[in-house]
Amino acid sequence: MGQIEWAMWANEQALASGLILMTGGIVATAGQFTQWYLGTYSIAAGVLVCLLEYPRGRRTKGSTMERCEQKYMTKVVKAFGPLSRNYYIRAFLHLGLSVPAGFLLATILGTACLAIASGIYLLAAIRGEQWTPIEPKPKERPQVGGTIKQPPSNPPPRPPPEARKKPGEEAVAGVPRGAPRKTPCPVTDEVV
């Protein structure tokens, strides 16, 4: 049985916790809680976490399903270099972002989720995992000569293979090539 790639779990957990943190921040700010400024901090922290976590990393084995329009954010995250690739840095960044939001009831759920994501990222870093971007593979165009052995000789619709006659069979049957064939039923041009 293969090893678990913890970074994939941490990525999903952190993205969800960023959304939860933003939602709690909106509730705290709109509800004018006593420490509403922590709500605005939570909105900003949630947006930062979501932007950092939106692009999925490539799995070491198998294929990875890319998120919609991920390629644009991948370029931004990739530009930060080792700051975004290293999971130790992500773990401590998420843990640091979650602490101030823990002092407000509306954002405590997002704080707990982000702390759990931080722990999973720390586990992924200890196991030696690293973020690598999903890069699109260049599309190979099939060679026309390589895929088609011999193009069809007669236009569609074509009769089934067993009904087709070989060119030599008509000559053996005594029917000259291109000559009209005789039908067993009489054909008339009258319209009834």
UniProtKB/Swiss-Prot annotation:
GO molecular function terms noted in the UniProt entry: heme binding; metal ion binding; oxidoreductase activity
Span list, region Disordered: 134-192
Chief localization: membrane
Keywords: Cell membrane, Electron transport, Heme, Iron, Isopeptide bond, Membrane, Metal-binding, NADP, Oxidoreductase, Phosphoprotein, Transmembrane, Transmembrane helix, Transport, Ubl conjugation
Gene Ontology CC: one annotated term: plasma membrane
Protein topology in the membrane: Multi-pass membrane protein
UniProt intramembrane annotation: 70-80
Topology, Cytoplasmic side: 2-7, 54-69, 81-86, 127-192
Extracellular side: 31-35, 105
GO terms classed as biological process: innate immune response; superoxide anion generation
Location(s), subcellular: Cell membrane
Pfam families xref list: Cytochrom_B558a
Post-translational modification: Phosphorylation at Thr-147 enhances NADPH oxidase activity by promoting NCF1/p47-phox binding. Ubiquitinated at Lys-149 likely by RNF145.
Glycyl lysine isopeptide (Lys-Gly) (interchain with G-Cter in ubiquitin) cross-link, renumbered residues: 149
Transmembrane segments: 8-30, 36-53, 87-104, 106-126
Residues the record lists as Phosphothreonine modifications: 147
Family per record: Belongs to the p22phox family.
Subunit structure: Component of the phagocyte NADPH oxidase core complex/cytochrome b558 complex, composed of CYBB (heavy chain (beta)) and CYBA (light chain (alpha)). Component of the phagocyte NADPH oxidase complex composed of an obligatory core heterodimer formed by the membrane proteins CYBA and CYBB and the cytosolic regulatory subunits NCF1/p47-phox, NCF2/p67-phox, NCF4/p40-phox and the small GTPase RAC1 or RAC2. Interacts with NCF1 (via SH3 domain). Interacts with SH3PXD2A. Interacts with DUOX1, DUOX2 and TPO. Interacts with NOX4; this interaction mediates superoxide generation.
Xref: PANTHER family: CYTOCHROME B-245 LIGHT CHAIN
Function, in words: Subunit of NADPH oxidase complexes that is required for the NADPH oxidase activity that generates, in various cell types, superoxide from molecular oxygen utilizing NADPH as an electron donor. Subunit of the phagocyte NADPH oxidase complex that mediates the transfer of electrons from cytosolic NADPH to O2 to produce the superoxide anion (O2(-)). In the activated complex, electrons are first transferred from NADPH to flavin adenine dinucleotide (FAD) and subsequently transferred via two heme molecules to molecular oxygen, producing superoxide through an outer-sphere reaction.
Protein's name in the database: Cytochrome b-245 light chain
UniProt source species: Sus scrofa (Pig)
Gene: CYBA
